[in-house]
Design a protein with these regions (language model features):
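ATP/NTP phosphate-donor binding region
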Residues: 1-82
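Active-site segments that bind and position negatively charged phosphate/pyrophosphate groups
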Residues: 183, 187-287
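Short glycine/serine/threonine-rich phosphate/pyrophosphate-binding segments
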Residues: 90-97, 119, 231
Length: 336
């Protein structure tokens, strides 16, 4: 990736793993679903210790976090070592937080193996785990020493997981107004143009993060669709994937934007939902979502900060009265 400086390399292409270099001894934690790809990386980096973990939200817990820390301490893994993390977004979030806190910080390398992780979790330095009370309530801003998004790892990805990850790329289209990202994405990992498409999506996030690393201003726009999404995930017991939840969150945001005087983006978002084919919305009542929304980490003194799309490439961020949210949610239920 060129022209945007984050202080570490971000490579998005086939064979990106070959460019990775890690100082000191290397430990590897990886999603057990990608063990073959992880072993290739492990051999290239001369890994001395490794641990396989299940993917999914169950790994973003205090229990698993403690397990990894204790395992590193048990083998005496040193501060000058590096942690290589291979997997989807949940593993990258967990692994980055382990690296941020073990011995008060060790180097780590990120090898995202899903479209969602490549476009979202791998770049930006957000690490963390969940609590029973909500998502990402414990964490740290901590950068990797390199991100290596190897498109070869997508070749065995199930189609629904491949498609689901591109919801974040579509979100970046809504934020940037880029017509390529607003169009329907490439249909599969072998499609021509996928590399350029993903590079463009990652570049949008890199540009925002370069302005505002600690999410005190411009970076908050990246939460578009995520307030409802995180509540949906929690209220449904994480039976919905993050990608599905964000897609529904984007539709809710589009309705909110129209209600507050913005451009009508609803048809565009619904077209993306049809392409994605998420599971049917569970018809949760607003009262079931509200406790999780009110605990949202984006909450400020005046209330939860909603990211409101007023047009492709233009958003506002601020609180919205609950009466308005309740009304919009009823419209949302009629559409889904």
């Amino acid at each position: 990736m060129k022209n945007i400086e984050l202080g570490y390399p971000v490579e998005v292409k086939a064979g990106a793993r070959a460019q990775a270099q890690a100082p000191g001894p290397v430990a590897l934690i990886y999603d057990q679903a990608v063990d073959r790809f992880a072993n290739i990386i492990g051999e290239a980096l001369d890994v001395e210790w490794k641990l396989a973990l299940p993917g999914g939200e169950e790994s973003k817990s205090l229990t698993v976090y403690g397990k990894v820390l204790e395992a590193l301490a048990q083998v005496g893994f040193p501060r000058q070592g590096s942690l290589a993390v291979v997997g989807g977004g949940t593993l990258l979030d967990l692994g980055g937080f382990v690296a941020a806190t073990y011995l008060r910080g060790i180097s780590f390398l990120s090898f995202p193996t899903t479209t969602l992780a490549m476009v979202d979790a791998a770049v930006g330095g957000k690490t963390g785990i969940n609590l029973p009370q909500g998502k990402n309530l414990v964490g740290a801003f901590y950068n990797p020493i390199g991100v290596y998004a190897d498109l070869d790892s997508l070749l065995t990805l199930p189609p629904n997981i491949f498609r689901g990850g591109l919801v974040e790329a579509f979100k970046h289209g809504l934020l940037s107004g880029d017509p390529v990202l607003l169009a329907l994405p490439p249909a599969g990992p072998a499609e021509p143009g996928l590399e350029a498409y993903l590079q463009k999506a990652v570049a949008v996030k890199m540009a925002v993060v370069a302005q505002d690393f600690r999410e005190s201003g411009a970076r908050r726009q990246l939460n578009l669709g995520h307030t409802l999404a995180h509540a949906l995930e929690a209220a449904s017991g994480h039976s919905f994937s993050h990608a599905e939840a964000v897609a529904y969150g984007l539709l809710f945001a589009a309705l909110l934007g129209r209600a507050l005087g913005g451009e009508n983006l609803i048809a565009r978002v619904r077209d993306f939902l049809k392409w994605l084919t998420p599971r049917p919305y569970p018809q949760l009542a607003w009262s079931e979502l509200l406790p999780f929304i009110e605990r949202d980490k984006k909450k400020g003194p005046a209330g939860v900060r909603w990211v409101i799309p007023l047009a492709a490439g233009k958003v506002e961020i601020g609180p919205v009265p609950n009466q308005v949210l309740t009304q919009i949610y009823q419209e949302f239920l009629e559409l889904v």
